[in-house]
């Protein structure tokens, strides 16, 4: 299986924002093919430690090879949503917390470009879409069994697809004739049901995004990480998030705002000072890829990086 090269987005900017203590303990919550992790290790001293996390067994295999190269690195097969409960990190939590956490929420080029993974409408393959190919329901299994109203809800909520109901109806009508098994097949049905294409965007883009997010519980996982982030960071520790679509970025932006300003509550509610506490300081402005990076990697065009620092 030939993989496309994966360019880590905002690599220099994210690592420089993350590594504030070369002797600290860090987490790369989306290891992928190790681009960010290798850059982090290059900035760490001999006492520094880095833990990589990934759902994808293929990414974990790459991480195992990096473990053999560098004793400061360990790979964990799982989700960053479980960060707080990872056994290997409990000693660091007990000792005061992590020096930094980085997550790059984008789908990697190998996942998108390898047809067998089923993420892309550009390459025909099995309609799978699972980040963790060893567990959970495939996209085909869900699409072929879900209620029409549930499909419409997913397309609307996770893809912001305005023709969600029309598409869901077309999907259900077609699966009654023949179940979906291939990405191109699904893309063609969605494409035909898209009444008005967005300029410069494939008509199946939003539907594929929506199903992928739903199958992999991407927003639920992100919400859990945001909820746990302050408690796992040491004072002065950095939280770096790179998001790729508005659903993710809105969640991250709102979280950083609430944690930096102190959460706002309606008047009259019984609110404690702890509930209104400022937990994060926002570092710099939201950052996007520059012209040079865009030339090298067009997929970085929608990336937005936000950085927060844990207050004591």
Curated annotation (Swiss-Prot):
InterPro entries: RsmH (IPR002903), SAM-dep_MeTrfase_MraW_recog (IPR023397), SAM-dependent_MTases_sf (IPR029063). S-adenosyl-L-methionine binds at residues 34-36, 54, 80, 104, 111. The keyword S-adenosyl-L-methionine applies. Its EC number is 2.1.1.199. The keyword Ribosomal protein does not apply. It catalyses: cytidine(1402) in 16S rRNA + S-adenosyl-L-methionine = N(4)-methylcytidine(1402) in 16S rRNA + S-adenosyl-L-homocysteine + H(+). GO terms for cellular component: cytoplasm. SUPFAM superfamilies: Putative methyltransferase TM0872, insert domain (SSF81799), S-adenosyl-L-methionine-dependent methyltransferases (SSF53335). It is found in: Cytoplasm. Keywords: Cytoplasm, Methyltransferase, rRNA processing, S-adenosyl-L-methionine, Transferase. GO terms for molecular function: rRNA (cytosine-N4-)-methyltransferase activity. Its main location: cytoplasm. GO terms for biological process: rRNA base methylation. Belongs to the methyltransferase superfamily. RsmH family. Specifically methylates the N4 position of cytidine in position 1402 (C1402) of 16S rRNA. This is Ribosomal RNA small subunit methyltransferase H.
């Amino acid at each position: 299986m030939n993989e496309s090269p994966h360019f880590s987005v905002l690599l220099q900017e994210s690592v420089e924002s993350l590594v504030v203590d070369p002797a600290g303990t860090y987490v790369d919550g989306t290891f992928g093919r190790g681009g960010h992790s290798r850059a982090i290790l290059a900035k760490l001293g001999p006492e520094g430690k880095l833990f990589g996390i990934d759902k994808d067994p293929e990414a974990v295999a790459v991480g195992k090879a990096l473990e053999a190269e560098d004793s400061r690195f360990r790979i964990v097969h799982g989700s960053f949503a479980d960060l707080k409960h990872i056994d290997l990190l409990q000693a660091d939590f007990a000792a005061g917390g992590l020096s930094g956490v980085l997550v790059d929420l984008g789908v990697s080029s190998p996942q998108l470009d390898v047809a067998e993974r089923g993420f892309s409408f550009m390459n025909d393959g099995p309609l799978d879409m699972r980040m963790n190919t060893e567990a959970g329901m495939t996209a085909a299994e869900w699409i072929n069994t879900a209620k029409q109203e549930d499909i419409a809800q997913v397309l609307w909520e996770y893809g912001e697809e305005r023709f969600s109901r029309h598409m869901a109806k077309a999907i259900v009508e077609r699966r009654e004739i023949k179940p979906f098994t291939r990405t191109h097949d699904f893309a063609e049905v969605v494409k035909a049901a898209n009444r008005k294409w967005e300029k410069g965007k494939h008509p199946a883009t939003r539907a594929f995004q929506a199903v992928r997010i739903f199958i992999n519980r991407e927003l639920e996982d992100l919400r859990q990480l945001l909820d746990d982030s302050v408690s796992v960071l040491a004072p002065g520790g950095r939280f770096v998030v790179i998001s790729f679509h508005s659903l993710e970025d809105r969640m991250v932006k709102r979280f950083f705002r609430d944690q930096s300003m102190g959460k706002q509550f309606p008047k009259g509610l019984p609110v404690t000072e702890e509930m209104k506490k400022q937990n994060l300081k926002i570092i710099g402005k939201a950052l996007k890829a520059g012209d040079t990076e865009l030339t090298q990697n067009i997929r970085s065009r929608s990336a937005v990086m936000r950085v927060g620092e844990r207050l004591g």
